[in-house]
Amino acid sequence: MASGELVRTALYDEHVALEANIVDFHGFELPIWYSNIKEEHLATRSGAGMFDVSHMGTFRFTGPRVKEWLESVATQKVTSISDGRCAYTHFLDGDGYIIDDMIFAVVSEQEILGVPNASMISVMWDWLNDKLPVDNSVIIEDLSPKMSIIALQGPKSEKLLTSVLGKENHVGRFRWQQIMINPLGVSGWIQGTGYTGESGYELSLIHI
């Protein structure tokens, strides 16, 4: 990407077609609202709202002692998180100030996924790599360029999700699973997380 060039998500053309108000958000061309912020806030609180959060990053952590290592660099007790569960955590600097927050999704004892904030992808990449075990027992992969992330939030989000992707793709709060076979043929994973205060999902979709 050339310096100063804005990045477009896979849904950019859809946003334009829906006449979204698009702004520069941490180097991405993203919709800030469609009709107006108040209407969309209330729609999410009373029904469901869908958000393109593909500017967020995706890291994959793997290794035989990945839980112990992440527990040593994050505030969450990662060794207590069972497979298929998610947990919120922070990363702190030497003075105890927050560098970034992240939601971990535990795939297995040797694989964990995490989503850094858009403006912190490169910062967290460098910070985490600087703290990797010297024996190379933990590996970090940046999956961000290969992924789109859609947040579906609100009290009617379950009804909407199951009508489109099937009941087998519903997950409970702070649960994680691979996306099962579905009518749209999309693949990736889904977790029962979000930042709106409502129930909902975050879908990480692999680019075809």
Predicted features along the sequence, with ranges:
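Basic, glycine/lysine-rich polyanion-binding surfaces/domains
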Residues: 1-206
